[in-house]
Amino acid sequence: MVIIGPRGPGSQRLLLSLLLLAAWEVGSGQLHYSVYEEAKHGTFVGRIAQDLGLELAELVPRLFRVASKRHGDLLEVNLQNGILFVNSRIDREKLCGRSAECSIHLEVIVDRPLQVFHVDVEVKDINDNPPVFREREQKVPVSESAPLDSHFPLEGASDADIGVNSLLTYALSLNEHFELKIKTKKDKSILPELVLRKLLDREQTPKLNLLLMVIDGGKPELTGSVQIQITVLDVNDNGPAFDKPSYKVVLSENVQNDTRVIQLNASDPDEGLNGEISYGIKMILPVSEKCMFSINPDTGEIRIYGELDFEENNAYEIQVNAIDKGIPSMAGHSMVLVEVLDVNDNVPEVMVTSLSLPVQEDAQVGTVIALISVSDRDSGANGQVICSLTPHVPFKLVSTYKNYYSLVLDSALDRESVSAYELVVTARDGGSPSLWATARVSVEVADVNDNAPAFAQPEYTVFVKENNPPGCHIFTVSAWDADAQKNALVSYSLVERRVGEHALSSYVSVHAESGKVYALQPLDHEELELLQFQVSARDAGVPPLGSNVTLQVFVLDENDNAPALLATPAGSAGGAVSELVPRSVGAGHVVAKVRAVDADSGYNAWLSYELQPAAVGAHIPFHVGLYTGEISTTRILDEADAPRHRLLVLVKDHGEPALTSTATVLVSLVENGQAPKTSSRASVGAVDPEAALVDINVYLIIAICAVSSLLVLTLLLYTALRCSAPPTVSRCAPGKPTLVCSSAVGSWSYSQQRRQRVCSGESPPKTDLMAFSPSLQLSREDCLNPPSEPRQPNPDWRYSASLRAGMHSSVHLEEAGILRAGPGGPDQQWPTVSSATPEPEAGEVSPPVGAGVNSNSWTFKYGPGNPKQSGPGELPDKFIIPGSPAIISIRQEPANSQIDKSDFITFGKKEETKKKKKKKKGNKTQEKKEKGNSTTDNSDQ
């Protein structure tokens, strides 16, 4: 507290002192205030918020608080005005005893950010304690033979105050025999003594009663008094005398009880009772309840009873006297100073305050976690404390002020590795042996969203049968997040995109919590073979993190499409077909051909033909090819055969269960000379067969040249486009693929516009031209860089027994068939190898497996039992079209061979049929001529 008085030299000195004090405070980084003890509640101490540079408005939000280690309730801060005031009674004597300096150390703590300020409040003494004597009356025996100027020490008064307030002034009541003299000791303390100025006469004055008054130096002055009773003794003119006027003893504070302190010795030259000495303790300063001293009255030995504590009192002053037994007795006085040496008997104390828990996982290095204070009541090296922390932790201790430390973050935290730390703070003093204490600090790491959900693998393949019920569960995705609580709460969603003309969400959906993927509508293999999409997993953190997984859903084919009959030149699709057959044709003559197509794939699209039992009679001279659908004569027709035959042909696929369709063929037998215009096989140029044959050959040559030229031009254009186009990677080309196969007898081509092809990329559709040669496995690189030498066939490949029946008939590809490539592309192998055959002389091949999935092998192999091995550049007789078990014959025939080259099935759109009508007309005319000559064409070769 600053007190302003009248101006003058004293006030100038006071002002200078205050300026020096303020400069010292700025240099030390602390605030210093002062307050008088016994101040009333609410007494102003200082504007602590203003002095610390804090705004009043931020005291409450920043949790402004004052902490004191032992005296937290004496002072308080008003958070409204930032004033430090007295909260409860301050007693300096109780707080600091007789210490010259007395202050209250405060810690001012504010958060956001965490700051600590140190404030010292000096407690100033006031004169609130009067000087007192230990006893109300002091008895002083004085021999009447005492010489003048004899000194008689008196017991002085004590004042609990300090400084000026404890400066004592003694005064003695008026008398004619004694005067008062003040004796100053080495420690600057004073001791009152009576000095004899006039000889005593016991007979005249046996007793004297004096009043000793004491006045302190405070304002206002406080006084005390004691009665001095002087007894005049008879002549015993020699009093006891100690060897030394004072003694000094040094003891360790850990001495045992009943330890001897010192052996005193006093002597009296008198004889008899006047020479017998009795020892006693007159006074012990300071007074202690723990430690007591006693003296043997006969021997003068002083012993200690109790415990010495350096931290309580580091020195004791024992005033002893020696009294003889003379009458009157005389006394000698001495003083024993006992100094206490400190030993390391106090364990350091550790106090953890202001914990900022939990600690965020992304907290910056240097963030203050807690404040730690240590103390040791010992002195010197025994009281010097060093703190240490548990090793190998991302924290460290930083000394801030004297015995104060800050626990700060030393390196980055990772909750996923360690979610909590048990720290041990060890405080060790410098004693020998050193003492130590520990304090445990539990630091919990709070999670932040720093880990994205992760899937077990980046891509999943799912197989789903078509015609599934709406809402069926097809797959479950699961992602794991290493974070905790809401940061690990994963939700799933579709990565929306377009699938053709529809949104992805119209096909599938994903449950946000479970990750279950559902098909919202029945899938159709014929429309959608592969559905590729992404599922996103996101956590609930802020900001949310996520990752994607790719799902490839392959739609497996089911036998849900019955064979469909194709239109013929003589009738519409599904209607009856009329054919005229001359009676002169021989056995094996092709009468008609039933053409059908199945929208399914694999076994489900593998068609077989048979005559219905109702249409089979004992004398019916016709049969149908099992896989070709060609109706041919079984023998030479004669007059006994009925002129009209109604044939019912059953077309059946190989699905489970099999689906069928029925075609009706009306066959009329006519004489050789008849050529009705209604016959589907009639030719306009039948009047001159030789001229018609020449015209047909010319047309055939022109058609073959045109097709070959178109093929070469297409290949050149395709190669030029591929070489000039920039290299791009496309997962899927949903365009219109074109397949061209070459053989010695010509070329056949296939072009099919897919209904819908789904892929994950956004690349534009491409039109691919795929050229295949038997016994060669093609890839994209093979098309651009053809090998110099053809590959040798694998001799381990065999035909299956189920297809041996088809080995004797060639499948002629026309516009009725569908040729598919599986979802894996032409590089995938068709698993058709079967080495377990009972007939080693014949090769085997198995039909497609898996309903069209992974059935894209274009490699043709012959077993070792087959005597024909294709050499380089040679072509095999038959090969398998992927997606269909049909066996394609490309055997080269002689130039004069009369093969019906029109019976060649291609799988594609119906528009392909129109392109080949002209070519068929020439073949039909030639066939009509051959029938007239009774020659046999076997198209099964």
Swiss-Prot record:
PXXP repeats lie at residues 734-737, 790-793, 823-826, 863-866, 882-885. It comes from the Eukaryota. It is found in: Cell membrane. Keywords: Calcium, Cell adhesion, Cell membrane, Glycoprotein, Membrane, Repeat, Signal, Transmembrane, Transmembrane helix. The keyword Metal-binding does not apply. SMART domains: CA. GO terms for molecular function: calcium ion binding. Its main location: membrane. Residues 30-697 are extracellular. Residues 734-885 are annotated as: 5 X 4 AA repeats of P-X-X-P. One of its GO terms (biological process) is cell adhesion. Residues 818-941 are annotated as: Disordered. GO terms for cellular component: plasma membrane. Residues 30-133, 134-242, 243-350, 351-455, 456-565, 581-678 form the Cadherin domain. Glycans are attached at N257, N265, N548. Residues 900-914 have a biased composition (Basic and acidic residues). Pfam families: Cadherin (PF00028), Cadherin_2 (PF08266), Cadherin_tail (PF15974). Residues 719-941 are cytoplasmic. The chain crosses the membrane at residues 698-718. This is Protocadherin alpha-12. It comes from Pan troglodytes.
